[in-house]
Amino acid sequence: MSSDSREGPSRFKFRESTRTPLEVPATVLIAGGEIQAKTANVSLGGVFISLPKPPPVGTMVKFALDLNEKAVRGFSEVVWIRPAQESLDRPVGMGLQFRHFLDDGEGALRLFLAEQLQNLEGT
């Protein structure tokens, strides 16, 4: 775990929870428009979503992550972006910090990530 931080209005502490490199389908609702995307990594605290034109830091985003048979839904905030001019060999997109899960989304995400980490350690 790292104590890196990114500057921004919320002074979000980057990488507070273990990130799992994981590409899963994601749907984000930004300014009334639904966008289909993919994650690059997921943690209990947030997610990086690859998106060609990420919205500005501070934007509230409704999200849905398709975790096999369970969709995890909720609300998040854009806490940092990686624009095209800074991407080099990394994906363009946005770092979202989870703000609120719907239903038992947090529990489902916790279980899913534990299974993914176990699979990674077993290989």
What spans do the regions from the language model cover?
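Hydrophobic core residues within well-ordered beta-strands of beta-rich domains
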Residues: 22, 35, 61, 72-74, ...
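Mid-chain, well-packed structural core segment of small domains
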Residues: 69-89
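Short conserved beta-strand and strand-loop elements enriched in small hydrophobics
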Residues: 25-28, 58-71
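Short, solvent-exposed secondary-structure boundary/capping segments
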Residues: 48-51, 83-97
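A residue-level detector for short acidic-glycine micro-motifs
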Residues: 30, 41, 78-82, 100
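Short, surface-exposed secondary-structure edge patches
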Residues: 17, 50-54
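Residues located in well-ordered beta-strands
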Residues: 38, 75-77, 97
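N-terminal helix initiation/capping motif
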Residues: 1-44, 110-123
